[in-house]
């Protein structure tokens, strides 16, 4: 599950003669990207952190004291922002970061190395949190094949899985934010979200690259699952 990072660039464009053309373009873009450089200065693990900052600055769902789940969290940029805004490092809220990959510790963030698609994942999360979540975040992107139609289906499928997980673990009134890509393949996803949430919209933060079809779906006001608000999902 691909995510952008701001790790040190060990090669320069000039010395990258052995790289493929696509890799050179990526490297040039990283070196020229002001958000990559700003993330390093701000001590953030990825430029993606600015995306959730922008979205939350406008819609204000990361409130002090709430419970947040970050799916596909590595390298941890979104978790860093969530922890700061809910106050989990000071014990005022909690952030659970979930990923298949290992992730270095972040103050105020509890890391769970697991697959959120496992049947017992919602119950495990519920046990860790002692209740359901107020916000579920997902900046995940499916691994691509280069075949446009196949990739679109994979991307939408991953978001649908994240949305289903959110429906299992969110409290009524909760919020779901997930990365999607502009295409005609997400109609079913949007229909499902509009059924489960009071407000659903697409947002594209300024820090999302202009030449990218990337955008985010923001679903607020979860209508609630069949069970009680704080009973373990089954």
Which residues does each PLM region occupy?
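Class I SAM-dependent methyltransferase Rossmann-like catalytic core
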Residues: 2-67
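Short glycine-dipeptide loop
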Residues: 89-92, 170-175
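A short glycine-rich, Lys/Arg-flanked "PGG" loop and its adjoining helix->strand segment in the class I
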Residues: 156-172
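Class I S-adenosyl-L-methionine
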Residues: 182-234
